[in-house]
Amino acid sequence: MSQLIFSQPSEDKSALEDAGDFTPRFDDRGLITAIVTDAGDGELLMVAHMNAQALALTIQTGTAHYFSRSRGKIWKKGETSGNLQTVKEIRTDCDQDAIWLKVEVAGHDATCHTGRRSCFYRTIALRDGKPMLDIVDDERHFDPQDVYGK
């Protein structure tokens, strides 16, 4: 499979906003933000980042690939856990500096490394003048210890 090459974004804002060439606008680290939701029910699953290679692999294979900022490398989401993300649709925002993946999750139907369906399982509430976290979805679809050995 040959590597997709993305053209440089146009300086003309209207060209970015219309149909035509997809010219993603990567940040100064070479990354683009990826918002990921469930293709069936629309639940927000995760927010991640992609470099050009991860984005190209995602488009070409139909399986979500991301760039890990902490590990400094590309990873196929779900490769270890079995919770692969099959991409059903990819959208971009008006100025092409963020993308939205609508996915189906295989395996345990979990996206978060904690074993939960979504990485957004906590709310933030102000108590006694201090921001605090509350867990609102504690259902584990798998045990991270069993899957990752952590």
From Swiss-Prot:
Cofactor note: Binds 1 Mg(2+) ion per subunit. Binds 1 zinc ion per subunit.
EC number: 3.5.4.19
Entry binding sites for Mg(2+): 93, 95, 97
Pathway: Amino-acid biosynthesis; L-histidine biosynthesis; L-histidine from 5-phospho-alpha-D-ribose 1-diphosphate: step 3/9
Cofactor(s) the protein needs: Mg(2+); Zn(2+)
Major place of residence: cytoplasm
Pfam families: PRA-CH
Compartments (UniProt record): Cytoplasm
Sites where the protein binds Zn(2+): 94, 112, 119
GO biological process, one term: L-histidine biosynthetic process
GO MF assignments: magnesium ion binding; phosphoribosyl-AMP cyclohydrolase activity; zinc ion binding
Alphabetized UniProt keyword annotations: Amino-acid biosynthesis, Cytoplasm, Histidine biosynthesis, Hydrolase, Magnesium, Metal-binding, Zinc
Catalytically driven reaction(s): 1-(5-phospho-beta-D-ribosyl)-5'-AMP + H2O = 1-(5-phospho-beta-D-ribosyl)-5-[(5-phospho-beta-D-ribosylamino)methylideneamino]imidazole-4-carboxamide
InterPro entries: PRA-CH (IPR026660), PRib_AMP_CycHydrolase_dom (IPR002496), PRib_AMP_CycHydrolase_sf (IPR038019)
The UniProt record lists the keyword Iron: no
Cellular-component GO terms for this entry: cytoplasm
Record's function text: Catalyzes the hydrolysis of the adenine ring of phosphoribosyl-AMP.
Subunit architecture: Homodimer.
Family that this chain belongs to: Belongs to the PRA-CH family.
Protein name: Phosphoribosyl-AMP cyclohydrolase
Organismal lineage: Bacteria, Pseudomonadati, Pseudomonadota, Alphaproteobacteria, Hyphomicrobiales
